[in-house]
């Protein structure tokens, strides 16, 4: 087929050259285009010492081209037969006779592998795992299967219905204490204690903030008047307090502190 397309392209090139530059009277080539592209293609092929190709049946022409190349003709109406003939030419077994599973199994057999599919994909998967030296996996319960896989890896099974217990078991495997028993505050405090920090929340967020500040070496901050607290903070950091009632004065004071 590629040869046919090449020939047509050659003919087109010859024809275009003919139009672009008419041949002189002394040329041994015939003029080309008289209205029938097939006749013209055949004339061009004849000039090249090749047989004409197209007389109306593309299959016959393809087979003729294959014959020119020393190959057997291929297509007589049944693409499967033709494919099998091509495989035979390459020294391969034919593949498809109507049952794709049989064909797949035949291919696996060629590779020295056992056939796989007889109707139950789980059985087939297990058979494949067995071939690899692994245990079968799925019998209906994904949790049991996961645990079996973990056991194969030398790990303990994990999930028996309570995700918190399972999380704690995992933490225990890592040498860590379990965390959650129902009270997130207690758990947070336990975690802080593990890190060498004091527990924090006991009901009053202001007390907790002050407790944090004290732990860091700062005095507690909020006792009811946010302006007083800001002034105390500014004083502690060596900055003079800013706001006494007039925001413009405060802004100007801030600018003055910056040398502006």
Swiss-Prot record:
The entry's keywords: Secreted, Signal, Virulence
Domain of life: Eukaryota
Signal peptide, first to last residue: 1-20
Annotated knockout phenotype: Leads to complete loss of pathogenicity when hum3 is also deleted.
Post-translational modification: Rsp1 is processed by the subtilisin-like endoprotease kex2. Cleavage by kex2 generates 11 peptides.
PROSITE patterns xrefs: PROKAR_LIPOPROTEIN (PS51257)
Compartment(s) where it occurs, according to its Swiss-Prot or TrEMBL record: Secreted
General function of this protein: Repetitive secreted protein essential for pathogenic development. Hum3 and rsp1 together are pathogenicity proteins that share an essential function in early stages of the infection.
Name of the featured protein: Repetitive secreted protein 1
UniProt organism field: Mycosarcoma maydis (Corn smut fungus)
């Amino acid at each position: 087929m590629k040869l046919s397309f090449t020939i047509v392209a050659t003919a087109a090139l010859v024809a275009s050259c003919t139009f672009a530059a008419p041949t002189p009277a002394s040329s041994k080539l015939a003029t080309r285009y008289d209205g029938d592209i097939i006749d013209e293609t055949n004339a061009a092929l004849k000039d090249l010492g090749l047989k004409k190709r197209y007389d109306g049946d593309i299959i016959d022409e393809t087979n003729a081209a294959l014959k020119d190349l020393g190959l057997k003709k291929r297509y007589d109406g049944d693409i499967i037969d033709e494919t099998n003939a091509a495989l035979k030419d390459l020294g391969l077994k034919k593949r498809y006779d109507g049952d794709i599973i049989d064909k797949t199994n035949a291919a696996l057999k060629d590779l020295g592998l056992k056939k796989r599919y007889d109707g139950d994909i789980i059985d087939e998967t297990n058979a494949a795992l067995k071939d690899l030296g692994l245990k079968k996996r799925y019998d209906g319960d994904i949790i049991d299967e996961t645990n079996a896989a973990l056991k194969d890896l030398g790990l303990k099974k994990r999930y028996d219905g309570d995700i918190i217990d399972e999380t704690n078991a995992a933490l225990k495997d890592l040498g860590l204490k379990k965390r959650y028993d129902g009270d997130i505050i207690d758990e947070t405090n336990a975690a802080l204690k593990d890190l060498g920090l004091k527990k924090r929340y006991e009901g009053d967020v202001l007390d907790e903030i002050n407790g944090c500040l004290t732990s860091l070496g700062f005095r507690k901050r909020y006792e009811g008047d946010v302006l007083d607290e800001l002034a105390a903070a500014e004083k502690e950091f060596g900055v003079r307090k800013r706001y006494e009632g007039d925001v413009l004065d405060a802004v100007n004071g801030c600018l003055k502190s910056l040398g502006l």
